Amino acid sequence: MIALIQRVTRASVTVEGEVTGEIGQGLLVLLGVERDDDEQKANRLCERVLGYRIFSDAEGKMNLNVQQAGGSVLVVSQFTLAADTERGMRPGFSRGAAPDRAEALYEYFVERCCQQEMNTQTGRFAADMQVSLVNDGPVTFWLQV
């Protein structure tokens, strides 16, 4: 399971002209589900995403996680993160989970974020989405479990 996390000052996702999720300061989480992923991996990745210390403390050091910084989380499914790009000029998607399984694990990940008392917003699974963000830093990390 993969999370591409970006520290943002604001982010939103729109589906068919409707804003489905919007946050101020926090994390935009682009979530990719791979073929062998399960709830245990989703739990571990959620723990890492919410615990990752990429927000500045009083001394300006990256020392606070999103909860400590008072931020929110916007989770957007992105199957292309599981692409095989090692050869050729076209990505392959055999590493990605089947759509039903990917959706179930995406929803599970979102629920785990909510259970941690995070203000959690979402996109819409498998939809054509427009994601807008202001990357703060820029600060972007690839987390994989």
Swiss-Prot record:
GO terms for biological process: D-amino acid catabolic process. Its EC number is 3.1.1.96. InterPro entries: Daa-tRNA_deacyls_DTD, DTD-like_sf. Keywords: Cytoplasm, Hydrolase, RNA-binding, tRNA-binding. A motif (Gly-cisPro motif, important for rejection of L-amino acids) lies at residues 137-138. GO terms for cellular component: cytoplasm. The keyword Secreted does not apply. Pfam families: Tyr_Deacylase. It is found in: Cytoplasm. It comes from the Bacteria. CDD domains: Dtyr_deacylase. It catalyses: glycyl-tRNA(Ala) + H2O = tRNA(Ala) + glycine + H(+); a D-aminoacyl-tRNA + H2O = a tRNA + a D-alpha-amino acid + H(+). One of its GO terms (molecular function) is Gly-tRNA(Ala) deacylase activity. The keyword Ribonucleoprotein does not apply. Its main location: cytoplasm. NCBIfam families: D-aminoacyl-tRNA deacylase. PANTHER family: D-AMINOACYL-TRNA DEACYLASE 1 (PTHR10472:SF5), D-TYROSYL-TRNA TYR DEACYLASE (PTHR10472). A Gly-cisPro motif from one monomer fits into the active site of the other monomer to allow specific chiral rejection of L-amino acids. Homodimer. An aminoacyl-tRNA editing enzyme that deacylates mischarged D-aminoacyl-tRNAs. Also deacylates mischarged glycyl-tRNA(Ala), protecting cells against glycine mischarging by AlaRS. Acts via tRNA-based rather than protein-based catalysis; rejects L-amino acids rather than detecting D-amino acids in the active site. By recycling D-aminoacyl-tRNA to D-amino acids and free tRNA molecules, this enzyme counteracts the toxicity associated with the formation of D-aminoacyl-tRNA entities in vivo and helps enforce protein L-homochirality. Belongs to the DTD family. This is D-aminoacyl-tRNA deacylase. It comes from Citrobacter koseri (strain ATCC BAA-895 / CDC 4225-83 / SGSC4696).
